[in-house]
Design a protein with these regions (language model features):
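Short, well-ordered beta-strand segments in beta-rich or mixed alpha/beta enzyme
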Residues: 2-9, 38-68
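Short amphipathic alpha-helical segments
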Residues: 13-38, 73-79
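Residue-level signal for secondary-structure boundary sites
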Residues: 14-16, 61-63, 99
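Glycine-rich beta-strand-turn "strand-cap" elements at beta-sheet edges
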Residues: 2, 38-49, 75-100
Length: 100
């Protein structure tokens, strides 16, 4: 399992949560992908306009295939989504090394 992790500083929390949450437009888009597990949305308790988004996939290959096959739509959605945030930082793609 891998996790693709982003941090966002947002303009409007409610709008951002609707778009990026587990039932939001991004998660709906990813659900079409083989190997997509789900999205987790975390809000910073000390800075409530800061969020972490974690998209989980069965493998890096599943993620890369989806992005490759849907690159045009992914880029279009990314451009449209810029209205929701002030800053986006991609932390990286992480794999589980220990599961309890």
């Amino acid at each position: 399992m891998i996790a693709v992790v982003f941090r966002y500083d947002v303009r409007d929390s409610e709008t951002f949560e609707e778009a990026y949450g587990p039932v939001g437009e991004w998660a709906k888009f990813f659900r079409d992908g083989t190997g997509f597990i789900g999205t987790e949305l975390l809000r910073d308790v000390e800075e409530p306009d800061r969020y972490i988004v974690i998209d989980r996939w069965e493998s890096i290959d599943a993620y890369n295939v989806f992005i490759s096959e849907h690159q045009k739509e992914y880029l279009e959605r990314s451009d449209e989504s810029r209205l929701f945030y002030l800053q986006e930082l991609r932390f990286g793609t992480f794999e589980n090394v220990w599961v309890d």
